[in-house]
């Protein structure tokens, strides 16, 4: 007995039908590709959710007051308390505020040990009763004032010390720190944290050389972790009066964020060459 002939049945795999659903379930035809529209909607939903979650991160207390009519009262009050606690902790750590000029015998205490923070001072507990041994960022300038870049770095240190009072800025003449330290390596910038050297930089080439500005130095501070990228004290985050007024107008016209987002898809409209310290000098910085 001959086998019955096989008939080739043409199936439109893109068709949304009950028969195609059966074939997909049995693996006869592949699953339908996700709709591009559905993918776009999902991506937009995720973007909106992330924006909503982080909407208050860059707001200061005055900004939070302006949002009282738009935000859930309990949520906003809890967030204000969180921000106040952050400000209080920053104030507790803001104990420097100047550039400290030291000599070699003071280096270990004023730099290495100081960078250990509360671990060096003695373990303390935070508001939750947990031990707090947070370190301190210490920036050290091995200086030679006859060099232009060293004078530039001294000026940057002075400005940064006044603004970021929780960071310790220390300056020491390079030849006092290390005998016969090469003048070509000056200025040298060393960053300590929790007793360790986490970054060193020979001359200001990495910042911009003779054209180094405060914005460049602040960017460096962010990169080494000494300052948070969203810190309102940074020049790049500072609002001028015009942009602040625009932001007030923007939030004044917006409906409550927590009441739901309508029309949410209408978006988009309207030293060494390698910058390291010579091995012979490593022992001094431990």
From Swiss-Prot:
It is found in: Cytoplasm. Residues 96-286 are annotated as: Thioredoxin fold. Coiled coil: none annotated. SUPFAM superfamilies: Thioredoxin-like. Disruption phenotype: Impaired growth, cytoskeletal disruptions caused by actin polarization defects, and abberent nuclear segregation caused by misoriented mitotic spindles. Cells are enlarged or do not bud, caused by cell cycle arrest in G1/S phase. GO terms for molecular function: actin binding; G-protein beta/gamma-subunit complex binding. One of its GO terms (cellular component) is cytoplasm. The modification Phosphoserine is found at residues 35, 62. Keywords: Cytoplasm, Pheromone response, Phosphoprotein, Signal transduction inhibitor. Essential for cell growth. Inhibits early G-protein signaling events following pheromone stimulation. Inhibits the folding activity of the chaperonin-containing T-complex (CCT) CCT2 which leads to inhibition of cytoskeletal actin folding. Plays a role in cell cycle progression in G1/S phase. Interacts with the G protein beta-gamma subunit complex (STE4-STE18 complex). Interacts with CCT2; this interaction leads to inhibition of CCT complex mediated actin folding. Present with 7700 molecules/cell in log phase SD medium. Belongs to the phosducin family. This is Phosducin-like protein 2.
């Amino acid at each position: 007995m001959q086998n019955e002939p096989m008939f080739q049945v043409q199936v439109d795999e893109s068709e949304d039908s009950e028969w195609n659903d059966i074939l997909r379930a049995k693996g006869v035809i592949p699953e339908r590709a996700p709709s591009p529209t559905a993918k776009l909607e999902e991506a937009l939903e995720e973007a909106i959710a992330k924006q909503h979650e982080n909407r208050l991160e860059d707001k200061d207390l005055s900004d939070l007051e302006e949002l009282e009519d738009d935000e859930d009262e309990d949520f906003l009050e809890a967030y204000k308390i969180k921000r106040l606690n952050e400000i209080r902790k920053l104030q507790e750590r803001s104990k420097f505020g100047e550039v400290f000029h030291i000599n070699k015998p003071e280096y270990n205490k004023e730099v290495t040990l100081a960078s250990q923070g509360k671990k060096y001072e003695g373990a303390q507990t935070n508001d939750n009763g947990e031990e707090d041994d947070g370190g301190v960022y210490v920036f050290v300038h091995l200086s030679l004032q006859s060099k232009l870049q060293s004078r530039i770095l001294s000026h940057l240190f002075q400005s940064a010390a006044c603004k970021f009072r929780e960071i310790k800025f220390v300056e020491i003449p390079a030849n006092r720190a290390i005998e016969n330290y090469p003048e070509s390596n000056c200025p040298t910038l060393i960053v300590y944290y929790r007793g360790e050297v986490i970054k060193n930089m020979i001359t200001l080439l990495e910042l911009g050389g003779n054209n180094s500005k405060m914005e460049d130095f602040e960017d460096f501070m962010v990169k080494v972790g000494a300052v948070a990228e969203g810190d309102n004290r940074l020049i790049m985050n500072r609002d001028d009066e015009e942009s602040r007024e625009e932001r007030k107008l923007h939030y004044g016209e917006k409906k409550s964020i927590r009441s739901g987002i309508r029309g949410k898809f209408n978006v988009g409209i309207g030293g060494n060459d390698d910058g390291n310290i010579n091995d012979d000098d490593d022992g001094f910085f431990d």
